[in-house]
């Protein structure tokens, strides 16, 4: 008995494999929808042996995963693995229902290899949400600041007030983060280590630390893959080679948090030899910054790992 779930902001498309048959239904991605999903599963006589699987995309899967975890085994899988499975199965078309069906099939075929999802601890969740909201506020402030440059006189004062309010909230969240670190010395030690990396500030340190503590990464390759910063080469047959690009199959929010640190590292010539080699090869600045983002992620992982092994 396997349940594949394709999660979006507003809906969850479900495919239940039971007794060799597929049963498909769409629900709202909210508590009412979760209850209707439970009723539907009970109608199909599901037991605690049901294995549920969804992709780790954004934040929209989290409430559902918490809910299902109370009753069933849940796996939250890296989208890259699902995509690789789809390629192997030669699935070319893409709809939400087909995605749910594919995830259910993946769950059935890989059942012995899948790891059960474990909800984050309270401190992991707190750090993650503080870091996430701090990023949200900073984005809002940046948007309003851009508007201010072109705003007419009768609108500018209102925008300035909004910016001041956002700045005040940002200061409050930063204070909460500092209080969190005081209450959790282990996190604080790791945070200080991360901030020794040129370009890594409070926000990016919090984002990297929350990701690192949340998932049991075995090596730096897994960590960069989780961030979607692992290189992927487009190749067709044995003779046609495309350009190498990052996979982008990973946590976009965390990847985004490394952009400004990469800009700072670039301006400070932290990786001058590395950057010069890329420039000689004719690489554009965007690709160079992405390469620096990956370097920062690797350095961060190794710093955190060495701290744990002390």
Q: Which residues fall in each region the model found?
A:
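Nucleic-acid-processing active sites and adjacent nucleic-acid-binding tracks
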Residues: 20-47, 51
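Short, glycine/acidic-enriched loop or turn micro-motifs at the edges of active sites
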Residues: 9, 58, 81
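Structural signal for membrane-spanning alpha-helices in multi-pass inner-membrane proteins
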Residues: 263, 301-302
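Short glycine-rich phosphate-binding loop at a beta-alpha junction
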Residues: 49-60
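Long, charge-rich intrinsically disordered scaffolds of nucleic-acid metabolism proteins
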Residues: 66-69, 75-193
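Conserved small/polar residues in nucleotide/adenosyl-binding loops
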Residues: 308-310
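Phosphate-backbone recognition surface of nucleic-acid-processing proteins
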Residues: 206-281, 285
């Amino acid at each position: 008995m396997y349940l594949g779930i394709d999660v979006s902001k507003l809906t969850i498309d479900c495919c239940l494999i039971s007794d060799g048959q597929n049963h498909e239904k769409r629900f709202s991605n909210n508590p009412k929808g979760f209850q209707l999903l439970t009723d539907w599963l009970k109608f199909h006589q599901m037991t605690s042996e049901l294995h549920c699987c969804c992709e780790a995309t954004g934040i929209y899967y989290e409430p559902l995963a918490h809910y299902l975890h109370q009753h069933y085994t849940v796996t939250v899988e890296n989208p890259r693995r699902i995509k690789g499975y789809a390629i192997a199965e030669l699935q070319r078309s893409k709809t939400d229902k087909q995605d749910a069906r594919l995830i259910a099939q993946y769950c059935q075929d890989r059942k012995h290899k899948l790891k059960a999802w474990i909800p984050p601890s309270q401190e992991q969740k707190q750090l993650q949400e503080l870091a996430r909201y701090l990023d949200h506020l900073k984005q809002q402030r940046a948007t309003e600041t851009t508007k201010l440059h072109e705003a007419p006189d009768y609108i500018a004062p209102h925008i300035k007030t909004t910016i001041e309010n956002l700045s005040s909230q940002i200061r409050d969240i930063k204070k909460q983060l500092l209080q969190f670190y005081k209450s959790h010395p282990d996190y604080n030690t790791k945070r200080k280590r991360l901030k020794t990396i040129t370009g890594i500030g409070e926000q990016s340190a919090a984002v990297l630390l929350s990701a690192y503590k949340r998932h049991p990464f075995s090596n730096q390759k897994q960590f960069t893959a989780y961030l979607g910063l692992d290189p992927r080469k487009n190749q067709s047959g044995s003779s046609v080679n495309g350009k190498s690009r990052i996979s982008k199959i990973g946590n976009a929010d965390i990847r985004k948090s490394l952009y400004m640190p990469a800009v700072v590292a670039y301006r400070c010539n932290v990786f001058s030899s590395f950057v010069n080699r890329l420039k000689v090869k004719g690489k554009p600045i965007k690709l160079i910054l992405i390469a620096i983002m990956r370097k920062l992620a690797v350095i961060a992982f190794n710093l955190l790992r060495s701290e744990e092994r002390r």
